[in-house]
From Swiss-Prot:
Gene from which the chain derives: attf-4
Bias (Basic and acidic residues) ranges: 179-189, 458-469
Disulfide bonds: none
Polar residues: compositionally biased ranges: 19-31, 138-153
Protein name: AT hook-containing protein attf-4
Extent of Low complexity compositional bias: 233-248, 443-455
InterPro entries xref list: Attf-4-like
Native organism taxonomy: Eukaryota, Metazoa, Ecdysozoa, Nematoda, Chromadorea
Transmembrane segments: none
GO molecular function: DNA binding
Claim: DNA-binding is one of the keywords in the record: yes
Amino acid sequence: MLQPPTLTPNANGEEFRGSVSTDRSSASPSNIDEIMEDDVNQKDEDEDLNLVDRVSKLETNFVFIQHQLSSIMNHLHAPQCKCTTCSKVNQPGAEEQKNDTSVLSQLFPNASDQQLKTLLDLSKMNKLPSQVVHKDQQNGSSFLPSANKTSENPKPIELKPLKLGQGYQMANGGGGGKIHTERLSEPARKQSRKVGFPPPVASYYQRKESSNPLVPPTPLSSIPNLITNSNAVSANTSTASPGPSSEGSGDDHLEAPNEVAHMHSSTVPATPTTPGANLFTQSMVDMLKLNAQNAAHSTGSPGFLRGRGRGRPKLIGDELDADLVDYMVSLKNSDPHGGHFTASQALHMARQYILERAPGLLEEHGGHVKLKLTWAMKLVSRIGERQREIELGLPAGTLSNMGRNLTNIPAGGNFMADMMAQNIFSQHMMMVNQQLEGGSPPASSSSTATTSTATKTVKQESKNGHQNEENLNVKQEASTMPEIINIKELNLPFLNNFLAELNDNNSGLIDGEIGAAGPSMAALFAPNA
């Protein structure tokens, strides 16, 4: 609140009214102009600072917007404006986006900064410094890496940086250095799989070289010496194998040198008894041992096979299979209960037997034989067939060579059929022996009487000494033992009469199989009847 002016009397006793002085010279300071100038300057400086900050902020924002728009346009593949103003404004952003790192980042979006840097170094050089080789001028035939040559030559090779992709076009041989680093090629491979492109050619050839079986991964010192042991191998195989026969094929024996070339670690140390065994696997050694013991394995000759003169050999070999069948028959006969082997039981026992005899044949020990349940089922049928042959006193393989007419008869299940088969063979063998010896069998039937008269005639002619060439030929033909293939080929009169009687009685004669008859028939045709 303003105070009222005070009135002071003058010397004349008059009072003066209060008034405000208008003289600025005494009231205002002397440097009023300087003060005003400083005030104006201070305001200008504040305005300048505010403008600088605002411009810098605007510049930063515009640069950000420019970069974002450039990135969006590059991703959308949108063409830029061709006017002068836009070209001047967009030129810095375009140059920024066209640098090498940005191009590589667009090509490999999943690559890290270190990978992009390595790719950039590769693109600016012909090859990596460790891969750069040059020809020695002194000897002209030695190629050494540049890393080793830098220590010998005082002037190392200077590699000038090139533009992106220039080294691949200017490399010697028409192609650039291949990138074999899996760490670098994995992002590109993933991206190519997403797009659907085929894999790179360099990676394809790299996998092809690494998986080539002709290139051994082991050094030469670990490969067995095939030249020094070739004589021992040839001597061993020559004694064990007489050579392929006309019936068999020798292709299986020609595969052994090829298998020897691919041997790595599954070799067997050589022993004095088996020379050259270090060049073969355990399965091959077992097969060579079997060939040395049995010539039928190498020749395929029917004369050495036990009742198997045709078709392909058994899975484990004919001889080993026959021994296995005999072993299983002995186990079956030793069972007091007379039990029957199932396929699984036979498979287990056969596996144990093969492990004892020739373990190298099985697949779990490096062999080629894989025992299956179907093979065991066939083994059970062969065991039953061999058991019937032993009960009938027949050699091995007789029933299989005679056909499948008698194989359906269960062993011990049809007494009449077993007795008939045994009686027929015993009667026939007795008559043949009597013809050879010149004796006369007891006249039990018309057939025996006929054979006795024939033998008496031959004996009388021999006593009188009036034999001629025709009689000699007849005697030789009578002494020749025919090959029995089926029962019906015997053509015996008493057998024909018996079969006719069975047909009259409706006993059922089906394809050579004789039906069950009563005990009177069994007693009639018993061996001691």
